[in-house]
Design a protein with these regions (language model features):
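Peripheral, non-catalytic segments that deliver or gate enzyme domains
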Residues: 2-18, 22-25, 65-111, 115-135, ...
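Active-site-proximal cap/loop segments of hydrolase catalytic domains
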Residues: 618-807
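Structural cue for short, hydrophobic secondary-structure segments
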Residues: 586-589, 615
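Alpha/beta-hydrolase fold active-site loops
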Residues: 582
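A fold-wide structural signal in alpha/beta-hydrolase
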Residues: 607-617, 773
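Active-site proximal helix/loop that lines the substrate pocket
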Residues: 589-592, 620
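Intrinsically disordered, low-complexity segments used as extracellular stalks/linkers
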Residues: 11, 16, 20-26, 30-31, ...
Length: 807
């Protein structure tokens, strides 16, 4: 491995950092300091042969880090880091250049450029499933690099141009693997995530391209025994192989709320997490403290903590972040390890490898952590915003840190801090902020000089470029409303929403979506004017000829308690302006997602049946400030259910929706809201379509992935301490009120919201004489990624809605 990676563990920590302080007490808003102590793995030059496990004096096999060093025990008695992932070579799976296009109306997204900026790796579904492709930014041909059936999720081209790393979701499920392949399609290999029950997530590359960071998730407890009813097959037999069933009894009614044994936490009382931890400024932190304005945001000196819930009850997976050499010249290097964690991602490494920028924590409680890699001392912790996981980066000399953060603010801004030689912040400044708008994407060019910012303005994107002379910051207490001044440049976008920004040497590449086109990739050859890549589908090919996509109009409902709401109304073509029409209220997932004005083939199908669509953002949605996101926490969820009814009333009073022909529909959390709305407001809707929705929050916690449970406990309530609240919020509790027919859809490999949630609601509806049907999609997880299944789903849903609303 090159010197960049070796520097992570080379030398004596005290010699390199003479000013290093002893481990300090953790501030009260960032968790427990000793929950999952990281272990250092010293890389050794070796051949591709793995070293065998060593034997202890007692004769038992000792787990090692992959380089022969024993793994230290964590403070809770569990191993702090799990065995390093083993590299698995795979056969060449690249396709021919410019393979025949199966789907004309295809999407391209998630671009990553080679060092020259002339070629892009990207994800494209022209073959019917998201796959890894590469091609020149300004021409043809393109090439398929992995023709396997597993959907691709993320892509990253190495800084030296020799490798392309990417993640796949075997079986379409929630567990992912990290792979690498040469740009010509050779040397394809699995880097992590092949072990049964594990999952792997892609991080950043070392800046010299010698290694890539990967987070490996390993269950902290043994899987439950298979259920005799076969629930283990429905919940988890897919992506990571058999053996990760959840032991659920599909024949039971309401759950007793007991957690599986693998979620039993350490001693201590559990509690519902209250308001967002970053809203309550709390007591002053012990000195020295890093502050934004007058608000303490973290203290240096502590080791990396785990992600446990208050009171010591944790039920996340064990997460270990490694630096892995795809050439297999050096052993994996452990960067950090935590237990009972929701997330852990390495977002950046300093050029010399001495500092790592980590993102950790459940949604609503994300944090940026600066870690010294030599001694695993935390030098800075700062709350950061949800959304895009790539939260920021170091400057080229690691003398500054740039972050997308909403620490003690309603909206995310660009913050920078000067760093001392040990990685401690010397002070913070606000570089860019906008009143009422979130900074949702942040990218610095590879030379670290230019920042590209994407702002979310009521669901629409605005892209701003900060040149080097403008990146000087404003006063810490300042709240600039329009960036940093007239020197910043704005990019005129051909479509409404930017989903990704990547630098392409001296140029940029943007992934765009819009209300009238499929996702595509644009590049900026002159740095100012986006040009569509030739292999992205044309606007006119977005839908079949004859019926163009509908551009939505914004609506602004008001909740019964006075809270302003937002949404987008789609009018079915061919109707007079004031003509009452059947209307589908469509609810997004999250709950922190946001309805964006982008083309959805499902909407296009429904609109073609003569049905209007109103897609609101009820409380809990992102894009309108942190207070709005947190407005549905705990018992605030009841107000979110009222928001659905209030938005429906607004669609009738302010729009052309026919009050006698209304339906409710949603996916994931939106599926939960659909189930709940049908039993909370049984006379409001004629029918409902729930997609991958929760019907009983107790059984949801029993069956979901541990890291998802970590985040969900913050949003809905803790499954032990708040059992009664979860029972009140569960649609199954009020199933006797159901009147309207319901259509449920679920992916067979969904381990986010297991299929049991749809099965038990449909079964209960039928037992009460209410028409109900369930569509289970094969080889799909929580997201439907295969073209044939997506087509089946949207046609079946539209058929159901048309039948019940036009009868």
């Amino acid at each position: 491995m090159a010197s960049n990676a070796r520097n992570l563990t080379a030398g004596d920590a005290t010699a390199r950092h003479p000013a290093a302080e002893p481990v300090a007490e953790r501030p009260p808003d960032v968790g427990t300091a000793d929950a999952g102590r990281p272990a250092t793995v010293r890389p050794e030059e070796r051949t591709t042969d793995e070293r065998p496990a060593e034997r202890t004096e007692e004769g038992t096999e000792e787990r090692t880090d992959g380089a022969g060093a024993p793994l230290p025990a964590g403070s809770d008695g569990l191993t702090a880091a799990f065995a390093a992932p083993a590299r698995i070579p795979l056969p060449d799976a690249s396709g021919p250049r410019d393979a025949p296009t199966r789907l004309i109306a295809h999407g391209c997204w998630y671009p990553s450029a080679d060092p020259s900026g002339t070629r892009l790796a990207f994800i494209c579904d022209r073959g019917g499933v998201p796959q890894l492709w590469t091609g020149p930014a300004d021409g043809e041909p393109v090439r398929l690099l992995d023709d396997g059936p597993d959907p691709v999720r993320e892509v990253s081209w190495s800084p030296d141009g020799r490798w392309i790393a990417y993640t796949t979701a075997p079986g379409g499920g929630e567990h992912t693997r990290v792979l690498c392949v040469r740009p010509d399609g050779s040397d394809r290999q699995i880097l992590a995530g092949a072990e049964p029950g594990s999952s792997a997530h892609l991080g950043c590359w070392a800046h010299d391209g010698s290694a890539v960071t990967v987070t490996v998730a390993v269950p902290t407890g043994p899987p439950a025994p298979p259920s005799p009813s076969g629930a283990d097959t429905a919940a988890g037999d897919g992506p990571s192989g058999p053996g990760r069933g959840f032991g659920l009894d599909l024949g039971s009614g309401l759950s007793d709320g007991r957690l599986p044994d693998r979620w039993r936490g350490r001693a201590g009382e559990t509690e519902l997490l209250g308001p967002a931890p970053h809203t309550d400024r709390g007591p002053a932190l012990p000195s020295p403290a890093v502050t934004v304005g007058t608000t303490p945001i973290g203290a240096p000196g502590g080791t990396l903590p785990g992600g446990t819930l208050p009171g010591g009850t944790g039920f996340g997976d064990g997460l270990s972040a490694y630096l892995i050499d795809p050439d297999a010249v050096a052993a994996p290097v452990l960067i950090a390890a935590v237990q009972d964690a929701a997330t852990l991602r390495v977002c950046d490494l300093s050029r010399d490898g001495s500092l790592a920028l980590l993102r950790r924590g459940p949604r609503g409680r994300r944090e940026a952590v600066v870690l010294r890699t030599a001694d695993h001392v935390t030098t800075c912790v700062l709350p950061v915003a949800d959304g895009d996981p790539w939260i920021g980066s170091f400057s080229p000399r690691a003398d500054a840190l740039r972050l997308r953060s909403n620490a003690h603010r309603e909206f995310a801004v660009l913050l920078t801090a000067e760093l001392d030689p040990d990685g401690r912040p010397l002070g913070w400044s606000t570089v860019a902020a906008r009143e009422g708008s979130d900074l949702e994407l942040l990218r610095y060019t590879r030379d670290g000089a230019t920042a590209v910012l994407a702002w979310n303005i009521r669901g629409m994107s605005d892209v701003e470029i900060l040149d080097p002379d403008t990146d000087t910051g404003t006063d810490t207490d300042g709240r600039p409303e329009e960036g940093t001044g007239s020197a910043s440049r704005h990019i005129s976008l051909p479509h409404e929403v930017v989903t990704r920004v990547t630098d392409a040497n001296s140029r940029l590449a943007l992934a765009l979506s819009g209300s009238r086109r499929r996702p595509g990739i644009w590049w900026l050859p002159d740095g100012a004017t986006p040009v569509r890549t030739p292999w992205s589908s044309r606007d006119e090919d977005a839908v079949p000829p004859g019926r163009p996509p509908v551009r939505p109009v914004p609506l602004r409902p008001t909740a019964r308690d006075g809270l302003p709401l937002n949404g987008w109304y789609y009018r079915a073509p061919g109707r007079a302006p004031g003509e009452p029409a059947p209307c589908v209220i469509h609810l997004h997932g999250g709950p922190e997602d946001q309805e964006r004005p982008v083309l959805d083939p499902l909407y296009h199908e429904i609109l073609g049946r003569g049905l209007d669509i109103f897609a609101p953002d009820v409380r809990g949605s992102s894009g309108y400030g942190r207070s709005f996101v947190d407005a549905d926490l705990g018992r605030g969820r009841f107000a979110a259910l009222d928001d659905v009814a209030d938005c429906t009333a607004h669609a009738v009073l302010a729009g052309p929706a026919d009050p006698s022909r209304l339906a409710v529909m949603g996916r994931s959390y939106g599926g939960y809201l659909t189930f709940a709305s049908l039993v909370w407001h049984p006379d409001l809707f004629r029918t409902g379509v729930a997609v991958c929705g929760m019907s009983d929050l107790a059984t949801f916690f029993e069956g979901t992935e541990p890291w998802i449970a970590q985040s969900a406990a913050h949003k809905y309530g803790h499954p032990e301490r708040d059992r009664e609240l979860l029972r009140e919020l569960s649609p199954m509790t009020r199933i006797d009120a159901l009147r309207a027919p319901v259509f449920a859809v679920h992916g067979e490999h969904d381990t986010n919201v297991p299929p049991r949630e749809s099965e038990q609601f449909v079964r209960a509806a039928r037992e009460r004489g209410v028409p109900a049907e369930l569509l289970t999609l094969r080889e799909e997880g929580h997201d439907f990624l295969r073209a044939d299944n997506r087509r089946l789903f949207r046609r079946a849903a539209a058929d159901w809605l048309q039948r019940h609303l036009n009868s």
